[in-house]
């Protein structure tokens, strides 16, 4: 991540501190107010019917957030796919996609028999969901309504998960699941570009259930939101998998020098988790979210390799490394999701999922 990007993220998360930061913030703040007003009007026009929203013939559950950047959404979507499958429902995920398969065409990543596109065509998150859940339907569609319609009418979806759908009001939904980072739910509280929020905090009134993600064990209290809240933690598995599929215990790596890298929005939490499992990290590298791992990335990794014995990264990053020749062994560590309030999410969603129109 560039110094400019790091500076902006600091400003958007913690707010201005220095005179220069206050000057920049004062310039961005009116733009944020304007953007927030536009988003309020947009939501109002959908609510009163001036803008049309596509209504599917099956239950649609939106999984989204209020801010840009990571809230740990992919593990939650993965969890919901598995839950729908446990209810014997044919489930589809419809995603806008990111940096995969340029163009506006609808792409079926998985039709229920594993991925049928490569990660470059599908995008990292849809491809990872398809690999983890080969019996699910995964579609990337810049026009989400088109993707939902295709999943239901052509592929037999009985439940649709609208990935990153909170602001995508052109598709009607039966349930809005809103994810918030437990440690920084609203950043500095301002709307883009003055902060990280896609909409004003008042938009949370549309939410049906709020999930505080990445909760530390000592978390006290909760975010001020207008609805029920559940808490979850993202926990590293006790084993790591290299790029050839060989499994090794994290304990085996603890005595070696590790170099951790990640192209996710909030890599610091991942790095801390690795260290909490006893790994010694001599260096950490933060690439941009959804990084493509190009020649520049290869040069950075080659240089970093001088100070370590192995690389370690996330599942989402590992799927994009097949084309690279790395100078050290590289391991990925899977994440699993643990809800603090066992059963509350399922209790809310079960009647929605079971209600076929």
From Swiss-Prot:
<protein>
    <recommendedName>
        <fullName>Tetraacyldisaccharide 4'-kinase</fullName>
        <ecNumber>2.7.1.130</ecNumber>
    </recommendedName>
</protein>
<comment type="function">
    <text>Transfers the gamma-phosphate of ATP to the 4'-position of a tetraacyldisaccharide 1-phosphate intermediate (termed DS-1-P) to form tetraacyldisaccharide 1,4'-bis-phosphate (lipid IVA).</text>
</comment>
<dbReference type="GO" id="GO:0005886">
    <property type="term" value="C:plasma membrane"/>
</dbReference>
<dbReference type="Pfam" id="PF02606">
    <property type="entry name" value="LpxK"/>
</dbReference>
<keyword id="KW-0547">Nucleotide-binding</keyword>
<dbReference type="GO" id="GO:0005524">
    <property type="term" value="F:ATP binding"/>
</dbReference>
<feature type="binding site">
    <location>
        <begin position="67"/>
        <end position="74"/>
    </location>
    <ligand>
        <name>ATP</name>
    </ligand>
</feature>
<comment type="similarity">
    <text>Belongs to the LpxK family.</text>
</comment>
<keyword id="KW-0443">Lipid metabolism</keyword>
<dbReference type="InterPro" id="IPR027417">
    <property type="entry name" value="P-loop_NTPase"/>
</dbReference>
<dbReference type="GO" id="GO:0009244">
    <property type="term" value="P:lipopolysaccharide core region biosynthetic process"/>
</dbReference>
<comment type="pathway">
    <text>Glycolipid biosynthesis; lipid IV(A) biosynthesis; lipid IV(A) from (3R)-3-hydroxytetradecanoyl-[acyl-carrier-protein] and UDP-N-acetyl-alpha-D-glucosamine: step 6/6.</text>
</comment>
<keyword id="KW-0808">Transferase</keyword>
<keyword id="KW-0444">Lipid biosynthesis</keyword>
<dbReference type="InterPro" id="IPR003758">
    <property type="entry name" value="LpxK"/>
</dbReference>
<dbReference type="GO" id="GO:0009245">
    <property type="term" value="P:lipid A biosynthetic process"/>
</dbReference>
<keyword id="KW-0418">Kinase</keyword>
<keyword id="KW-0067">ATP-binding</keyword>
<dbReference type="GO" id="GO:0009029">
    <property type="term" value="F:tetraacyldisaccharide 4'-kinase activity"/>
</dbReference>
<keyword id="KW-0441">Lipid A biosynthesis</keyword>
């Amino acid at each position: 991540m560039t110094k400019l990007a790091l500076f902006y993220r600091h400003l958007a998360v913690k707010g201005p501190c220095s005179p220069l930061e206050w000057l920049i913030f004062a310039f961005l703040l009116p733009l944020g107010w304007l953007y927030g007003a536009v988003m309020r009007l947009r939501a109002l026009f959908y609510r009163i019917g001036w803008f049309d929203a596509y209504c599917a013939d099956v239950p649609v559950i939106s999984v989204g957030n209020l801010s840009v950047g990571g809230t740990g959404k992919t593990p939650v979507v993965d969890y919901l796919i598995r839950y729908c499958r446990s209810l014997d429902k044919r489930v589809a995920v419809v995603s806008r996609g990111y940096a995969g398969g340029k163009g506006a065409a609808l792409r079926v990543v998985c039709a229920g028999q594993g991925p049928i596109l490569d990660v470059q065509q599908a995008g990292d998150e849809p491809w990872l969901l398809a690999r983890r859940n080969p019996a699910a339907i995964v579609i990337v569609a810049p026009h989400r309504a088109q993707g939902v319609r295709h999943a239901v009418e052509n592929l037999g979806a009985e439940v649709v998960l609208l990935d990153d759908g909170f602001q995508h009001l052109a598709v009607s939904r039966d349930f809005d699941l809103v994810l918030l980072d437990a440690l920084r739910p609203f950043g500095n509280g301002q709307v883009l570009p003055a902060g990280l929020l896609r909409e004003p905090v008042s938009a949370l009134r549309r939410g049906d259930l709020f999930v505080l993600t990445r909760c530390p064990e000592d978390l006290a209290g909760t975010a001020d939101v207008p609805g029920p809240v559940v808490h979850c933690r993202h926990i590293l598995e006790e084993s790591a998998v290299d790029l050839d599929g060989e499994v090794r215990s994290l304990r085996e790596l603890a005595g070696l020098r590790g170099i951790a890298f990640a192209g996710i929005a909030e890599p610091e939490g991942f790095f801390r988790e690795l260290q909490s499992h006893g790994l010694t990290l001599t260096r950490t590298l933060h690439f941009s979210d959804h990084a493509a791992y190009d020649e520049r990335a290869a040069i950075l990794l080659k240089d970093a390799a001088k100070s370590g014995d192995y690389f370690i990264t996330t599942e989402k990053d590992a799927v994009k490394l097949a084309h690279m020749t790395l100078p050290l062994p590289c391991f990925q560590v899977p994440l699993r999701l643990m809800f603090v309030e066992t059963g509350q999410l399922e209790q809310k969603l079960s009647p929605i999922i079971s209600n076929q129109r």
